[in-house]
């Protein structure tokens, strides 16, 4: 499992858990045009438009 932090151009911060390795996740998100599922800091589910992503940061990668 990979824990990822996403910051948008508006300054909001979101979190994603994915089964993909971090590098593959970043590659897919930067080449994808649409919405991704994420959670807010209080774990409220939401969707983020990929063209509003400012940064994608690895928090922790399990199971390497």
Label every PLM stretch briefly.
Residues 35-64:
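Short, mixed-charge low-complexity intrinsically disordered segments
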Residues 1-31, 37:
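N-terminal acidic leader/helix
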